[in-house]
Each structure stands twice: as structure tokens, then as C-alpha cells.
Amino acid sequence: PRILSSAASDVYKRQLLFTPEVDAKIHDSFIHSRIGLKKPAYVFNEKFDFIDYVYKENKKRVSCILVDEAQFLTSEQVKQLCRICDEKNIPIMCYGIRTDFRGELFPGSLALLSLADNIIELKTICEYPSCSRKATMIARYDKDGEIVLEGNQIDIGADKYKVYCRKHYRLSLIHI
């Protein structure tokens, strides 16, 4: 995830940062960037009501909301964030992935793709050796290094996943 820079922090005086409960257990309620920056974040779960929380906090003039790992939002929570954006004119930035290891959309991602005013794709490169294509697929591996095709949609741990272009994802499935 991209952490707001100090320049953005100056513009957005009162930021509310959110991270999902499933990720917070690993990261101690902080949002971590790949370059080592970290910021404290409020933790949400599937029952969290963004409207109640933000409307109470807006007495302190919230100027920006950032949601990390937004694929873990429910579709109702995405609608709540849209309402906050529309009614309070608060910019909301959501960061997350589109699909799971089976190539299926997360419910939060589906809702965001349907309702977002603007979508910016942050590109990454396929992890297959010597490939330079854009990564669009996520593969999950078990402890023995074997690719997994079944199981819970959520299994936290970056060491269990690799990103591939569609071609190399498909080829990795053939070897099973």
C-alpha cells in the first residue's frame, strides 16, 4: 500500500486510516508500506459501521479517509463509504487487490469496481523468472510449495502468495 507522503499529510490534516481485522493481527494495527514506512490505523471487521464512526469523528473535521486491504470490505461498507464521500465531501482512497487465488473477485473489490468514481491500477510485474508482463493473477502455495486451488478465500500471509501474468498463472496450473 502507498502511505500518504508528508506533503499529502499537510494537505489532509485529519486523516482516518483503516485496516481490516484479518490483516491487523499480523501488523499490530499499522499500515505498512513496502519501503518500510508505517502508520497507525483503525481496525475494521465485517460488522464495522463506517457511517457511525466517521460522522462522530467528523466533529474533528476529517479531511481524508484511506482504507488499506479494501478487498476485505463488505459491499454494504463500500456503500457506506460512498455515502460519506457524497454527503461529507471527504476524499476516500481504497487500496487492495481485485481477485483471490482462484481468480474470483472479492466482494469488496466487486463493490468498489462498481461504485468507485475513479480507479487507478497499481501495476506489478509477473514473478515468473524472466517474465516482464503485467501481473494480473495471484497464486497461493501451501507449506510444501504446491499451488493451492481450494480452500478459504482468505489465508493471511504474504509468503504464501505469488503474482503472475495470466499466461504463467495458467501454466503453473497445468503442472498440478
Indicate where each model-derived feature is located:
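Inter-Walker segment of RecA-like/P-loop motor cores
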Residues: 14-59
